[in-house]
């Protein structure tokens, strides 16, 4: 269905996970909220029972996980000019726009074929990291960021649940190993004391 119908740029990677997965992150999210370690953030924390639930739809048989690599889409001078404030790559423009544009191609195809689907992009009702590791696309680093070899953390995620059975991508094992430079370098210690639910020990 997809190979002959949709063209996507090299910056978009796609992984596939079979559902149901049995995964549920609700208790972790609620624990962080109870301990007041979420810095009063409402995103994801507003409805943990639903946002942390991976198997949201009984009709779904697959989840397509999209990652948009934006590391080469920025003005590097904004990061390297001395004497000026540095603007984070993520903040230089709305990188969700190309991600949404390409995911919509899949939505439109599924809808045209009357294939049931549901999309989550930057949505507080879905913990979008939950399927990233299982898809084999990368891992959750000690920096709390989702990392992919050759890309690093400069990517945005989206998910489509779909009723079709797609062949899942291979689940692979990644880790930071003994490296903890991000935790050592963090000036406030936030990587150890704040977003613990996103950072492996």
Task: Give the ranges of each region predicted by the language model.
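Conserved small/polar residues in nucleotide/adenosyl-binding loops
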Residues: 197-201
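Auxiliary alpha/beta "docking" domains used to position bulky ligands
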Residues: 1-175
């Amino acid at each position: 269905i997809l190979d002959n119908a949709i063209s996507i740029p090299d910056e978009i990677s796609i992984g596939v996970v079979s559902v149901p997965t049995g995964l549920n992150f609700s208790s972790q999210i609620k624990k962080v909220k109870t301990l007041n370690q979420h810095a009063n953030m409402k995103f994801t924390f507003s409805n943990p029972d639903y946002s942390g639930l991976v198997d949201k739809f009984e009709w779904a048989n697959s989840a397509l996980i999209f990652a948009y690599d934006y590391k080469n889409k920025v003005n590097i001078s904004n990061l390297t000019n001395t004497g000026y404030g540095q603007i984070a790559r993520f903040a230089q423009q709305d990188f969700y726009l190309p991600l949404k544009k390409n995911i919509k191609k899949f939505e439109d195809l599924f809808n045209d074929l009357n294939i049931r689907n549901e999309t989550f992009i930057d949505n507080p009702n879905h913990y979008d990291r939950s399927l990233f590791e299982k898809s084999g696309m990368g891992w959750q680093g000690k920096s709390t960021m989702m990392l992919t070899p050759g890309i690093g953390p400069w990517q945005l995620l989206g998910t489509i649940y779909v009723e079709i059975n797609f062949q899942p991508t291979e689940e692979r094992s990644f880790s930071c190993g003994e490296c903890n430079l991000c935790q050592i370098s963090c000036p406030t210690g936030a990587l150890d004391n704040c977003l613990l639910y996103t950072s492996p020990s």
